[in-house]
């Protein structure tokens, strides 16, 4: 996987880079695994904006991804590696021996023609999914479940991977991409390997228009708003905040203020926070 630049025909074009998509084998998705995806533009069921800076963008179909990998013991052959507009990782279309088709998150070095399988007896091979208790310590994994049978929730982004550090009783200790060390039940499943599209993080968007295609709208500074729109707004010219520190549009402290709940269930499962030295 690589990125490429462009001739500097404009200031934005000078900086812009794109993926070369060398691993992609087709641009025609499997029709039976597509569903409509309505653009909510950051609104909830009452029509109120709950997430700012969302709206517009390209209209996409959602690809149904198999995060559970619960079809045990049935080998599946990789037929295509595809681009998914709804996530940073690539996806792979696999066809099981009984004819069923599913999409999975494509790991790095998974190729068309490879065979993947899931279940407790699966080999330690890239793309295979099995319970953590059956995975050797030190193995690099992704698509990690937080609750057995619920489906993968951790380590799904492009280029990410976790490492199995230890097993202690009913729990396994993982080192996550953020550096956080946490416990996960050993019955939870994970997939062997690293998520595909390793160079995703070095792509330079280059211009605002590409962000608009992604459905992301501009972010306006509070200091240039009116005082009825933002606590930083108002005043003549470039005015200071006028408070002890910067705040959000709703008056809560911004920049470094901890928003995590004090008594969250997972506190006892986190051995080391991502920002601990």
From Swiss-Prot:
One GO cellular component, as annotated: large ribosomal subunit
Pfam family, one: Ribosomal_L2_C
UniProt feature, compositional bias: Basic and acidic residues: 264-277
Annotated region described as Disordered, given as residue ranges: 215-277
Any GO MF annotation of the entry: rRNA binding
Keywords for this protein: Ribonucleoprotein, Ribosomal protein, RNA-binding, rRNA-binding
Superkingdom: Bacteria
GO biological process: cytoplasmic translation
Record-linked SMART domains: Ribosomal_L2, Ribosomal_L2_C
Family: Belongs to the universal ribosomal protein uL2 family.
PANTHER family: LARGE RIBOSOMAL SUBUNIT PROTEIN UL2M, RIBOSOMAL PROTEIN L2
Subunit organization: Part of the 50S ribosomal subunit. Forms a bridge to the 30S subunit in the 70S ribosome.
Function: One of the primary rRNA binding proteins. Required for association of the 30S and 50S subunits to form the 70S ribosome, for tRNA binding and peptide bond formation. It has been suggested to have peptidyltransferase activity; this is somewhat controversial. Makes several contacts with the 16S rRNA in the 70S ribosome.
Protein name: Large ribosomal subunit protein uL2
Organism: Clostridium acetobutylicum (strain ATCC 824 / DSM 792 / JCM 1419 / IAM 19013 / LMG 5710 / NBRC 13948 / NRRL B-527 / VKM B-1787 / 2291 / W)
Name of the gene this protein is made from: rplB
């Amino acid at each position: 996987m690589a990125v490429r630049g462009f001739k500097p025909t404009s200031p934005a074009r000078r900086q812009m880079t794109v993926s070369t998509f060398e691993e992609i084998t087709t641009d025609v998705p499997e029709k039976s695994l597509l569903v409509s995806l309505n653009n909510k533009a950051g609104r909830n069921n009452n029509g109120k904006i709950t997430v700012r800076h969302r709206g517009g963008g390209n209209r996409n179909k959602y690809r149904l991804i198999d995060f559970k990998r619960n079809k045990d013991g049935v080998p599946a052959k990789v037929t295509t590696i595809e681009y998914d507009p709804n996530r940073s990782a690539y996806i792979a279309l696999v066809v099981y021996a009984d004819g069923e088709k599913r999409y999975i998150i494509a790991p790095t070095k998974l190729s068309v023609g490879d065979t993947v399988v899931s279940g407790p007896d699966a080999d330690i091979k890239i793309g295979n999914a099995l319970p953590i208790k059956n995975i050797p310590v030190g193995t690099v994994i992704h698509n990690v479940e937080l609750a057995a049978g619920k489906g993968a929730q951790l380590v799904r982004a492009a280029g990410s991977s976790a490492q199995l550090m230890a097993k202690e009783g009913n729990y396994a200790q993982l080192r996550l991409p953020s550096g956080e060390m946490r416990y996960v039940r050993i019955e939870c499943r994970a997939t062997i390997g690293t998520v595909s599209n390793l160079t995703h993080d070095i792509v330079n968007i280059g211009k605002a228009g590409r962000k608009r295609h992604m459905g992301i709208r501009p972010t306006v500074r509070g200091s240039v708003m009116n005082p009825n729109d933002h606590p930083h707004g108002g005043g003549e010219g470039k005015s200071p905040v006028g408070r002890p520190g910067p705040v959000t549009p709703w008056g809560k402290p911004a920049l470094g203020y901890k928003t995590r709940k004090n008594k969250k269930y997972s506190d006892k499962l986190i051995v080391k926070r991502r920002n601990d030295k």
